[in-house]
Regions:
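Intrinsic low-complexity/IDR segments
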Residues: 1-39, 43-44, 48-49, 53-84, ...
Length: 317
């Protein structure tokens, strides 16, 4: 860790200001890579385009600072004051922001790939078009934040408060949103494929993600059961049906049409049993029904007859 005195830091900031104001003609870009700046008072500092990757920023005051387009990758931001800071376009790749205060900060277009944001104050933060892929946001308060167009693939958002957040057109593929509060959130246009939304609160949320099976009418479906048999089902017109964020669907009743092996051939078996409940039988010609069907579509693994619209999907499951 590179130690920096207050005098050295002031000189670096002065030269950096000249570099910024002259568009790189005068002065020198601030090179604070690996520097120990813990406890420094940098309120309102202009660090646009500076290099601070791997820097130690414990308890640094960066309130109202301009850190746009700054390299902050792998930096340690524990307990840092970043209220109203401008971090637009900044590189925060795998940065540790544990217990920092980012109230009203601007992180639009910032790269937060793999960043740790545990116990961070993120009220009213602007994450518009930010890259938060694989970021750890577990249990954070993101109420009223702007996450429109953000990349949240594989992000950990379990137990997160996203009340009234703008998540429109965001990419949430494979994100973990179990037990999250999404009440009054705007999820219009969001990519929710394979997102885990188990036990999340969607009261008042704006969401237009379609289910993976026909919403009306009867149709043919398939499911894999015990001993790797494929059951062909007729989902009747009056069956309740839903899906969460994958191709797997659920319904409350269906008629068994046929039972075949994985290769599509029949060995004469007319009754097979569920993989998850060996007392639940599927017999050709009979109607099976689940009385305690869970109408919450986001509880993908909950009660119901699980199925796929195509036979190939059932075979591969």
């Amino acid at each position: 860790m590179k130690e920096i005195t207050i005098k050295q830091l002031n000189e670096i900031l002065t030269k950096h200001a000249e570099w910024v104001n002259s568009c790189g003609v005068k002065g020198a870009r601030a090179d604070l890579r690996g520097a120990n700046l813990s406890g420094a008072d940098l309120r309102g500092a202009d660090l646009r385009g500076a290099s601070l990757n791997n820097a130690n920023l414990w308890y640094v005051n960066l309130k109202n600072a301009n850190l746009s387009d700054t390299d902050l990758s792998n930096a340690n931001f524990c307990c840092v004051d970043l209220r109203h800071a401008n971090l637009s376009g900044a590189n925060l790749w795998y940065a540790n922001l544990w217990r920092s205060n980012l109230w009203c900060a601007n992180l639009s277009y910032a790269n937060l790939l793999g960043a740790s944001l545990n116990d961070v104050n993120l009220w009213y933060v602007n994450f518009r078009h930010a890259n938060l892929e694989s970021a750890n946001l577990k249990g954070t308060d993101l109420s009223d934040t702007n996450l429109s167009g953000a990349n949240l693939r594989y992000a950990n958002l379990r137990g997160t408060n996203l009340w009234s957040a703008n998540i429109s057109n965001a990419n949430l593929r494979y994100a973990d949103l179990r037990c999250a509060n999404l009440s009054d959130a705007n999820l219009s246009g969001a990519d929710l494929w394979y997102t885990d939304l188990w036990n999340s609160n969607f009261n008042g949320a704006k969401i237009d993600f379609p289910i993976a099976c026909p919403e009306k009418g009867s149709f043919i479906a398939f499911k894999k059961v015990k001993d790797d048999y494929i059951v062909e089902l007729l989902i009747p017109e009056d069956a309740r049906r839903c899906s969460a964020t994958s191709e797997k669907c659920r319904c409350d009743k269906a008629k068994v049409l046929s039972i075949t092996k994985l290769d599509g051939t029949s060995d004469g078996v007319d009754t097979v049993y569920s993989k998850h409940d060996e007392a639940f039988a599927y017999k050709i010609g009979e109607i099976v029904e689940v009385k305690d069907f869970d109408d919450n579509r986001w509880n993908e693994c909950s009660t119901g007859i699980h199925f796929f619209v195509t036979r190939q999907e059932a075979v591969e499951y």
